[in-house]
Design a protein with these regions (language model features):
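Generic alpha-helical structural element
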Residues: 9-16, 35-38, 98, 102
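A generic structural signal for ordered alpha-helices
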Residues: 5, 20, 27-28, 91
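A mid-sequence, solvent-exposed acidic-amphipathic segment
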Residues: 21-45, 50-55
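Helix-loop junctions and short alpha-helical segments
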Residues: 1-21
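Alpha-helical oligomerization segments
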Residues: 44, 55-139
């Protein structure tokens, strides 16, 4: 099981349903190496969760939000980007990408998902901090 503090923090947060928590923690386990389908499935579940928070994430960092959703939509995660018969979705570079390189980009996308959830959590924390600061400064 992965020992990434970020993965554990996000997996244990209220933002993540229990059925997805274990998948997040085990994502970087050695047994997952080369398992593109399982990695894709985990990222897809995270993408679904982030879709519901997309507006909020865009307020935190619109460029980051744009980048992560670009990866979801163009790396054969949410859409079939490798079948040339699917007009408008096919991406030659993705279709030609060696599995090792695609796995690298899946791993980067996973890391960006962790960061997205942490940034959303920090946005909530910042609101609470601002309230505390206001109380402290008003005395």
């Amino acid at each position: 099981v992965e020992k990434s503090p970020a993965a554990i923090s996000v997996a244990e947060s209220e933002q993540i349903p229990k059925e997805i928590s274990y998948k997040m923690i085990s994502y970087n386990h050695h047994s997952m190496r080369g398992n593109l389908q399982e990695k894709k499935n985990t990222i897809l579940k995270l993408a679904e969760l982030l879709e519901a928070k997309r507006t909020e994430l865009a307020k935190v960092d619109s460029k980051f939000c744009s980048d992560i959703f670009y990866l979801f939509n163009n790396l054969n995660i949410r859409h079939n980007n490798v079948d040339p018969s699917i007009s408008g979705k096919f991406k030659q570079a993705v279709a030609d990408m060696p599995p090792e390189k695609l796995e690298h980009w899946y791993d980067e996308t996973y890391q960006m998902c962790l960061l997205a959830f942490l940034r959303l959590e920090q946005a909530d924390r910042k609101m609470e901090f601002d309230k505390l600061k206001s109380v402290i400064e008003s005395n």
